[in-house]
UniProtKB/Swiss-Prot annotation:
Record's function text: Serine protease inhibitor.
Protein name (record): Kunitz-type serine protease inhibitor stephenin-2
Xref: InterPro entries: Kunitz_BPTI, Kunitz_BPTI_sf, Prtase_inh_Kunz-CS, TFPI/VKTCI-like
Organism of origin: Hoplocephalus stephensii
SMART domains assigned to the protein according to its UniProt record, in alphabetical order: KU
GO molecular function terms noted in the UniProt entry: serine-type endopeptidase inhibitor activity
Stored Gene3D superfamilies: Pancreatic trypsin inhibitor Kunitz domain (4.10.410.10)
Gene Ontology CC: extracellular region
Annotated site, Reactive bond for trypsin, chain positions: 41-42
Amino acid sequence: MSSGGLLLLLGLLTLLEILTPVSSKDRPKFCELPADSGSCKGNFQAFYYNPDQHQCLEFIYGGCDGNANNFKTIDECKRTCAA
C-alpha cells in the first residue's frame, strides 16, 4: 500500500474514533440493568440509565432491594452511566 493510502486509512480511522459515541464497554455493567423499584412500598424519586434510549430516566423507588442502576439524582446517573 502506498504512503498516500496509509495516510488516508489513518485519517479515516481517526475520524471514526472521534465520531463513535462512548462504548457500552466503558460504562459499568450495572448501567445495563432495568429499573427495579424494589420490594418495599416507599415512594422515592430515583433515576436509572436506559441503555436503549441512551439517557437517564426517572422512576419510583420503593426504598429497599432493587439493583445498582439506581441514583438519587439525574446528575449522578449521567456521570456514572451516560458519560
